[in-house]
Structures are given as C-alpha cells and as structure tokens.
Regions:
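Conserved small-residue
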Residues: 1-56
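Outer-envelope beta-barrel architecture signal
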Residues: 60, 71-73, 146, 168-172, ...
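Outer-membrane beta-barrel pore domains and translocons
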Residues: 69, 80-82, 177-181, 213
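Repeated loop/turn-to-beta-strand initiation elements of outer-membrane beta-barrel proteins
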Residues: 72-77, 162-163
Length: 214
C-alpha cells in the first residue's frame, strides 16, 4: 500500500493500479475515450485503484412454504432467501472504528471498538481508530449478504364441526402467528436485507386471531 507516514494500527489501502499519462502528466485515453490503465501500482490512491467486488442484487432468490394439517390443527411455515450477493456493512462504517470522533458527541458505538488495535493489544485485526488519510468505502466492510429468512409461522386449531352444528356455526378457528422469527446468515450487521447506516431491521411481530364463519 502506498500510504506514507501511517501510524501503527491505522487503516491501510492497497495501491493496485494507475493511469497511463503523457509527458505532461495528463491521462491517456483509449479509442473509447476511457482512461488507459498501467496495470501496476503508481504510488497514488485514486479512482484507478477501484475494483468491482460484486453487487447487492442477488444472483438468485428462493422461497418455500408449506402447510401441515393433523385433525383440527394446522401449521404453516414460509421461508425466503437471497444468495450470491454482497452487502456493505454501513452500520460498522458509522458506529465503529471509522467514526470515533462521534465519541465527543456522546454517541454509542459497537462493542468491537473495545478490541481496537493499540500498543497493548497488538494482536487485534481491527484498526486503531486513529483518523485515516483514506476515509472512503472499501472492501474491509464488504460482507457476504446471503440469507434465509423465516417470514412467518402460523399455528391454528379449528373446532370440530360436530360441535359447531349444535350452535349453528360454520367454522371457528383460533390461531397464533409469529412474523420474522429468525434469519440464517453470516452477515454481522443488523439485517442483510435492510441495513444501511444502522437502519431498522425487519421487525418481529406476534399476532393472535379468531376466524368465525356463520
């Protein structure tokens, strides 16, 4: 990485590419009007060092649901998921090592800040929190964003029809529904589906209901 005068524990960015320039230092364009790359480090961190890591759009999605019934009981479960995608952990960007100046503003931070690199904690892989000379988004905060979410689980019971005939009722069903009970993912932020600058995750809900048919 070409980042002179860095202090121990500061965030380092790799210099991977550069632009071809003429004798006056002006970038050379190809026949399509785009900058030509040297394919090797040039001692400058700029747009030439940007690389395409992936996309937040899923490579493929899936959904699965089923209803199980036994006598008067019924159980419905629905799952869905997204795969082959990357997510930028903006929550860590805002509430972790890169915004420690917010401590002076009395804001809260993620617990991982306690494991920042320091002279007494040299085995940590986390930056020291000292203001860096390159405060731009990087691959350090990119994570696998695949997930499988259980959207809802509904459990119900229908009163036997032979009992309802005596009171002239067509159907009575009681049920309980749990929305968004859990999600399976390797993403370390709040929610791989909604996370942006500590945005609210998908809420969990509880519902109880009664279906009556006359």
């Amino acid at each position: 990485a070409y980042m002179p005068n860095l202090l121990p524990g500061q965030f380092k960015v790799r210099d991977v590419n550069g632009w071809e320039c003429d004798d006056f230092g002006n970038p050379i364009l190809d026949k399509n009007g785009r900058y030509k790359y040297t394919g090797k480090p040039d001692g400058v961190l700029n747009e030439a060092d940007m690389v395409l890591l992936g996309t937040t759009d899923p490579g493929f999605s899936m959904g699965f649901g089923n209803t199980f019934s036994y006598k008067g009981f019924d159980l419905n479960i629905f799952f869905y998921g997204m795969f082959d995608r990357l997510v930028y952990n903006a929550t860590r960007d805002k509430y972790s090592f890169f915004e420690l100046r917010r401590v002076l503003q009395g804001q809260n931070f993620l617990e991982e800040v306690n494991d920042s690199w320091s002279s007494t904690n040299t085995n940590s892989n986390n930056p020291s929190g000292i203001v860096t000379t390159y405060p731009q988004p990087s691959s350090y905060l990119m994570e696998q964003g695949w997930f499988i979410r259980c959207k809802n689980i509904t459990f119900g019971y229908s009163i036997p029809q032979r009992l309802l005939d005596n009171i002239k009722m067509g159907k009575i069903r009681v049920y309980a529904e749990l929305g968004n009970p859990f999600v399976i993912t390797k993403y370390t932020g709040n929610d791989p589906e909604t996370d942006f600058k500590a945005g609210y995750p998908n809420q969990r809900s509880y519902m109880f209901g009664l279906n009556l048919t006359f």
